[in-house]
Design a protein with these regions (language model features):
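Basic/aromatic-rich interaction segments and small domains that mediate binding to polyanionic partners
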Residues: 5-47, 59
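Long, low-complexity intrinsically disordered regions
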Residues: 53-60
Length: 60
């Protein structure tokens, strides 16, 4: 699945809802707030699924 910058995603194995902030070296860069600070991590696309609040776009 292709994600766009500002899409909401979450890890398939469970975890926080995150926002896609970009792509680097074939990885999806994400950020989220854990209640104390902003966290960031890069994931493979196949590790992510759409979040509950994912933006609806015309992906044609």
């Amino acid at each position: 699945m292709v994600f766009f910058v500002s899409d909401e995603v979450k890890p398939k194995k469970g975890g926080p809802r995150m926002i896609v902030t970009g792509y680097s070296s074939g990885m999806v860069e994400c950020r989220w707030h854990d209640g104390y600070s902003i966290k960031r991590e890069a994931f493979r696309e196949d590790e992510l699924q759409p979040g509950d609040g994912q933006h609806q776009r015309d992906r044609a």
